[in-house]
Amino acid sequence: MELFWLEHKKLWRKKIVKICVLLCFVYCVIFGSILSFQWFGFGSSDDYTSAFGNNFDGYTVIKDSQEYALSFGGELTDETLQQIVSDYQQMEADGMEEELEKTDWQIVNSWLGTLYPELRDTSNYKTMISYVDPDKLTGFYERRQQVLDEFLEVSGQVGAEKEFLHQMERKVEKPFHYEWVEGWSTLLGSMVADLGVVMALFLGIVLSSLFAGEWRDNTSTLVLTTRNGWGKIALAKILTGFAFTVELFALLAVSSVISQLFFMGTAGWDMPIQNIKLIAVAPMNMLQAEIYEYAFVLLGAIGFAGIVMFISAAVKNNVLTLLLSLAVVYGPMMIAEYLPYEMQKALDLIPLAGSSTDIFRTNTFRIFGKLIWSPYLLITIPVWIGILCMPFAIKSWSRRMKA
């Protein structure tokens, strides 16, 4: 334990570590959460001369939007959808531009495009919600089921796989609970979902020197002569790397959640994720989805940390270690679209290379003849990869030190 604390203090004393933590916090929390809520994500846009085209009044807009959504009764039915669309068209006709900003028009418009494609007027430059006849918006859940079936057929998900996904979907409570959706859509679609990708960059910078830095700093001789030996020191370094990963995640996650609670409160936590993507099959509400996404980031970051430390132990050069580490995450993202679909799914299992937004998709894996929903593997396989890298890191470090 003493060695661990020494290594932990040694890591945090480095100026580059403090700079990385600060930059990561500024990017993910200040810009990615606080300013996104208050300014360029939800600020009103009547003043197009302001930065990002938005005003610095996101808090007020969010509260007004939540209050407006509550006026529709809390359940999403045909009548609710008709009322939402009719109300939007009336406000637009009355020139109430500011009032339109508190509506869920982007979400509702996506529903219309998905469920009522025959009502789309290609000659009309306006969005569907502006011109569609509200009286024709019937059969919401029947149409959703039809669209889901068609999507599965087109995706080649038939037979046992289709039935497996239908069994999941049947657990989704209907009618859907409805409150303001746009905030949760942004939160789950980008704010939390992108956290891991950003963390990977800074984890790579910090942890790449954990082992390789000993050669640069000419401390390898000291390690050889210490009474503790390479084995205990290697373990202390690995535990330090994992501890730093958890600490960085905790700093970002706790700060982001506090920001979220300040701006959005808890309103809408029990809405189904189907309000964001209609053909999602997971029986999850917004809170459960957020917990999953944070778990995805944490476990993926731990897995990635294990890989970085293994590379650092095997490679003497800091820069090469960093480049190889970043290639693990960003490489699959760059080449995935050029690979077969099954290969893309396999690459998603690499720590932080996949996406927590798979909860909105219908991807599955077949392992030993058993179908498994992809999000389950996306939070378990990455962390196991990181753990399995530990003995290899120690072995690589040992081989180099003895040489």
List where the protein language model places each region:
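Residues that define the loop-to-transmembrane-helix transition and helix capping
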Residues: 18, 231, 318-320
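Short hydrophobic, aromatic-rich alpha-helical segments embedded in or entering the lipid bilayer
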Residues: 343-364
